[in-house]
Amino acid sequence: MTIIQTVTELGVTEDTIKVQMAPSGGKHLLADPGNHPAEHFESQMSWLRFQTRQYLTRFTDNQSDFVHSLQKKHRTPFRDVYFKYTSLMGSHMFYVIVLPMPVWLGYRDLTRDMIYVLGYSIYLSGYLKDYWCLPRPKSPPVDRITLSEYTTKEYGAPSSHSANATAVSLLFFWRICLSDTLVWPTKLLLLSLVIFYYLTLVFGRVYCGMHGMLDLFSGAAVGAICFFIRIWVVHALRNFQIGEHLWFPLLSVAWGLFILFNHVRPIDECPCFEDSVAFIGVVSGLDCSDWLTERYGWNLVCSRYASCGSKVFLRPLVGVASVIVWKDVISKTAVYTLLIKLLRFHDDRSEKVHFHNETSEEEECLLYSGVSKVEIVGRFLIYAGIPTTVFLLCPVFFTWTNLR
């Protein structure tokens, strides 16, 4: 089947094809995942998976027109810059730097809850993205306003930004409303800031041309589910002492690797699985850090501003530097030496790189080729080391530098 025949089935004229594939900034109509005709997916999906996708496409078929009309009506240079940069609040590096902050300021439990709701929101939204294989709003006609081309290569629904924003906003709502130390004027101010954060992040995904309404609503559902499950688990296990059970860290690591190696295979290349690996690694690293702390009775809780004064604000300088040193300097060499040199894992990374190098000149979105197994385990361990650094090592560094 030729490209002209394919896109004609999608309701695009030959003149439009020539415009959209023009040399000056044009791109292949099938460059982004999820835009192929139904036959492309039917032959590679189970009956239930394909029928689910077909049902949901009724909500995505016309999303590009809606998003394009919204952009035409509301775009301004200021809003472009505002929503482009505030989208970083849902980015990978933002979480790496910002999530540890409450720990260093004395609010350890807040970061713990945030890691759980964000980690499983990322995993579940990524799983459903790869299961449904639904497209983002088409560009063109939509303009994608983004700082990262990486995210444009993911499927659309559910929106991980929407899932994360919903989970975190519900968590803050819950904590603020139940707080015994905050007076109501302060609570109302904080709740207003949470609402502002939520609307900025969620509406920004539509404004930036990255998502349609199905993406946002399904993402919000994922985030709400993860929040309510977390609250239920905290209540159900409130008397559970993890330090008394040797199996707890082993189960956490085994569960994390199990759900990663049993993640659904997307039809087209989609990079969102990498974020799932990273966040599930962080969850397991948190579990192992908590287990060590409770089992051996280590007092690693950082003092708060009331008892330590303004020097608490110097902790992030030491903390962020420690995280960066682990993630960008030490981790890869240490982890892959452990896996390949000592544990004798088969290094299949070069096989995947070779495949991508051979096909990288193709303009059409590639079929999914799989992920290196040793890279899954390696990335899992690298990110498991981040909460270990934050929860176990940073308090020691703060003591050495008289910041604790």
Curated annotation (Swiss-Prot):
Active-site residues from the entry: 161 (proton donor), 211 (nucleophile)
Segments on the Cytoplasmic face: 108-113, 177-182, 237-241, 341-379
Transmembrane segments: 87-107, 114-134, 155-176, 183-203, 216-236, 242-262, 320-340, 380-400
Catalytic activity, reaction form: sphinganine 1-phosphate + H2O = sphinganine + phosphate
Annotated CDD domains: PAP2_SPPase1
Region (Phosphatase sequence motif I): 129-137
Compartments where found: Endoplasmic reticulum membrane
Superkingdom of origin: Eukaryota
Entry-linked SUPFAM superfamilies: Acid phosphatase/Vanadium-dependent haloperoxidase
Role of this protein: Dihydrosphingosine 1-phosphate phosphatase required for efficient ceramide synthesis from exogenous sphingoid bases. Involved in endocytosis and calcium-mediated signaling.
Protein name per its UniProtKB record: Dihydrosphingosine 1-phosphate phosphatase YSR3
Organism this protein belongs to: Saccharomyces cerevisiae (strain ATCC 204508 / S288c) (Baker's yeast)
